[in-house]
């Protein structure tokens, strides 16, 4: 970090010190400043016409583009499709507002339960004490697997990857964090696929195709069972050594009333997903409850994900009206829907792939399995995997190469096993 002082002298009087204007930039990263002014180190007087606020703004823009790359890509695709179609007025009609509203309600209630501290308390009870490494690692992997069925895969990882870090460090097993974090990412993706609210693409498909809970469970429960067995077997690779695991939780930070409020809102949201209660009513109840009792949660909602969905709805709607895309994607989804969904997820992530491909098929079964299994594979196949990687990289001694290597091995083996099961169950030889 460097502290930079820039003297801007009037061009008409370069030797006059009375006309100097002083700008002080403190704590500007040297590499950031070097990108703006490559020769600043050798320049005694920098004649520049911008202030520190501009640098800070540019830094925020770069950070946003990096952290919300999927949203930016979705927005670019939506704008490009509108430019080609020329039908800007029709754009809002392409957006499935029911899905957006339900996502908002679920994210709000889940965020409230997470902030209440209950998940951390549950983790403390399950992990702390005299434990074997194998049992601790299995518990750390099982928690996001089951939690993701209710609180979505990304929230499960946000809650339990830091728990894994603290638990393993307290026992001196931090070298095993890479494998545990990778297995947690896989567990969250595969556990979340079992329920309609386990991940965003499930909610979208369940809502769009008006599925029953029985149909949904029948399609994915076999894969969930196999996933749990494979994750349990993977945990056998950890040793059987003992250690005392200590996981401290601030008891004062646990808010049971907040948890009760958001658990009730979550139950209402699930009823709206199941079409028991009209979603506009639940949306009003959730928004009013947050405004009156817990306004902080408004800041915890992933608005970027909501905007990403809206952009891909617009993009998908425009693509569906283009004859060339109808022929291409319609043909692929007609001949190989599961494989097309799986491969598309590897390239553009499974949530965008779901929204895009849904406009070209009524075969919800193959689409659902394809995008859920498509969460395995490349790091960008599922946003939850990127969350796990980002959380891991914030730990001490994090090794990106080790994570990517472990991720590639585990995901390849898991995906291969899931594809074999799919072939055994649904492919007619």
Regions found by a protein language model. Give the residues of each.
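Membrane-interfacial loop-to-helix junctions in multi-pass transporters
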Residues: 97-99, 128-141, 170-180, 256-260, ...
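Membrane-core helix-loop-helix motifs of multi-pass transport proteins
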Residues: 172-240, 245-250, 367, 389-418
